[in-house]
């Protein structure tokens, strides 16, 4: 959409253009770096709205609007690569303001060209995992295959959001007889089995050489809610694990320790602590290259629900999850999910969900990986 001429001082340049290109994605020339998820039918391909960033030096009138715009002035381009299947993959190439150098995947480019070295990602925020809904093609694309995202870019740390789903005994559907019968027919009633699946997934990721940091998320916390509200006497499939985990929580409280129920569940299943895995508690900070990655994104300001625009007010750059949609608003970035809306089993109607992930480079610059047809990068016929 090169014909657009949006004022560089516009705070939300994409807001009025969601329907401008119909069902197609759009690219808007603008000095800010933003990505907005496009609204679509669940059966349609994901749609995204992008701004480009700019290559020009800032030159704003030093009054309120100009001073705010100068703060969000980003040296960046949107690079598009189209593979042999006709699928297009966008990457923001964000330059260091003092050198003009930038990262792309595992390479670092200077005014003299690529430096020829392999550069690991400092961090990767995959979309929310929801292990019990995670399909094998996505698992292979993300970390199992030799050319998977994790094995190719070798992030030092992988931030795991909503590792667990708890769809088998979720408080939102446990009183729904149809849902419970479907779970019975599919053999998906055992909570311990679902936790074991999450443990296996964490092991799969650490086997690649990356450290995993589990961000305490709303679906992980459903395990604790289950212990608070469920009646094990009417749930024989889960009674033993329920009581084992309940005893663990009461023992922790007796010692004056903070509850960390999902971690406890994983360690019971694993028979001890998981190697190279760290579990964060709610509100615990974890920084990656100057970016706050310790929040899931579900909790906002003063008890309100979390949102990407509200996190942008924090004064610290953030990487979060929760909304299952690729969203970039200035310094606040949110990743998507590792499942589609159709696979969730609970979300219906129009959607912005996407299989998208945030990569963080060692200089604090970031890139959003947009996955298509079980591909995280372009694929070419050799």
Can you annotate each of these PLM segments?
Residues 105-139:
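Mobile, glycine- and charge-enriched loop segments
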Residues 70, 230-292:
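Active-site-proximal loop/helix segment associated with metal-binding centers of metalloenzymes
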Residues 27-28, 49-51, 89-92, 157-161, ...:
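A structural signal for short, well-ordered beta-strand segments and their strand-loop junctions
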Residues 5-86, 288-370, 374:
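Conserved beta-sheet core of the metallophosphoesterase superfamily
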Residues 135-257:
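Core catalytic region of metal-dependent phosphoesterases/phosphodiesterases
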Residues 126-129, 163, 301-305:
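Short, flexible loop motifs at catalytic/binding sites
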Residues 84-119, 364-382:
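A short C-terminal boundary segment appended to hydrolase-like catalytic domains
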Residues 80, 128, 158, 162-163, ...:
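Divalent metal-coordination and catalytic microenvironments
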């Amino acid at each position: 959409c090169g014909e657009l001429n949006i004022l560089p001082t516009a705070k939300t340049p994409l807001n009025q253009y969601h329907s401008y290109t119909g069902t197609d994605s759009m690219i808007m020339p603008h000095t800010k770096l933003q990505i907005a998820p496009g609204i679509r039918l669940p059966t349609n391909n994901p749609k995204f709205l992008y701004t480009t960033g700019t290559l020009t030096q800032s030159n704003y009138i030093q009054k309120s609007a100009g001073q705010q715009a100068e703060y969000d002035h980003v040296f960046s381009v949107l690079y598009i690569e189209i593979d042999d299947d006709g699928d297009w993959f966008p990457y923001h190439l964000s330059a260091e303001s003092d050198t003009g150098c930038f990262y792309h995947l595992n390479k670092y480019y200077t005014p003299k060209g690529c430096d020829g070295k392999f550069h690991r990602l400092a961090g990767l925020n995959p979309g929310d995992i929801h292990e019990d809904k995670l399909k094998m093609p996505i698992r292979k694309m993300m970390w199992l295959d030799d050319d998977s995202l994790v094995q190719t870019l070798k992030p030092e740390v992988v931030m795991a959001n909503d590792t667990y789903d708890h769809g088998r005994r979720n408080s939102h559907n446990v009183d729904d007889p149809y849902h419970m019968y479907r779970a019975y027919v599919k053999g998906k009633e055992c909570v311990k089995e679902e936790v074991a699946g999450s443990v296996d997934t964490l092991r799969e990721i650490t086997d690649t050489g990356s450290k995993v940091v589990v961000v305490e998320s709303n679906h992980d916390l459903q395990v604790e809610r289950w212990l608070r509200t469920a009646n094990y006497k009417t749930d024989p499939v889960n009674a033993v694990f329920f009581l084992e985990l309940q005893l663990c929580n009461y023992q922790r409280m007796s010692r004056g320790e903070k509850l960390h129920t999902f971690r406890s569940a994983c360690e019971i299943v694993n028979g001890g602590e998981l190697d190279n895995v760290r579990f964060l508690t709610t509100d615990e900070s974890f920084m990656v290259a100057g970016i706050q990655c310790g929040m899931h994104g579900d909790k906002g300001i003063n008890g309100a629900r979390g949102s990407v625009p509200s996190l942008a007010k924090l004064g610290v750059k953030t990487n979060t999850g929760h909304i299952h949609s690729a969203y970039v608003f200035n310094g606040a970035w949110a990743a998507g999910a590792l499942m589609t809306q159709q696979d969730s089993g609970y979300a219906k109607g129009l959607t912005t969900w996407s299989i998208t992930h945030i990569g963080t480079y060692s200089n604090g610059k970031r890139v959003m990986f947009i996955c298509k047809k079980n591909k995280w990068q372009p694929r070419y016929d050799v």
